[in-house]
Amino acid sequence: MSGNAVTYRLGRNCKLYEGTAGAEATTEVTHAADVATNGTRERINITDRQLAALGFNGYASGLADLTITIQARRVANDAAVGAIRTAFKSASPISLKVLNGATGEGVKGDFVISDYNESQPINGAVDISITAYPTITDDSFPPTWIDETSG
């Protein structure tokens, strides 16, 4: 069997950064365990009589809805997770950047922290569950998709 070697992206090599709203996030969140970038698009119904006669609804893609979910370990004096917690408590935006590798693809921009939940199991580590939604605080730093070449 011959062919090209397959290079997989491993979660442990992915990166999450936080920073001051309005600027690119540069502080790595090292105690993040699981991070997910979740995207959906609105479905706009454009059914007309022609499609209806064929028995189908027709749709167009609408605006994208993006969330970042983060599972992190609660570690004393962790400045990066502390900055995210402060953003939640003060209802202030925070800059986040998620990459699927050290120089991979992902998303960056300003986000609001809508959910900040702390789990305290009797027989386990304290974990934090965070959900972030994009916002805009500065016209020069809108939420942006990052591809392999744009960094």
What kind of region is each of these model predictions?
Residues 71, 93, 133-135:
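Secondary-structure boundary/capping motif
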Residues 58, 97-101, 123-127, 138-143:
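Short, surface-exposed, polar/charged, turn-prone segments marking secondary-structure boundaries
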Residues 17, 29, 99, 145-146:
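Extended hydrophobic/Leu-rich segments
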Residues 74, 79-114:
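Short, acidic/charged, Gly/Pro-enriched secondary-structure junctions
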Residues 78-80, 106, 121-123, 140-143:
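Short acidic, gly/pro-rich beta-turn/loop elements at beta-sheet edges
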Residues 2-71, 110-131:
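Solvent-exposed edge beta-strands and adjacent loop segments
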Residues 73-78, 135-139:
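Acidic glycine-/aspartate-rich tracts in secreted/extracellular proteins
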Residues 1-6, 126-151:
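Protruding loop/beta-arch "assembly-hinge" segments enriched in small, turn-prone residues
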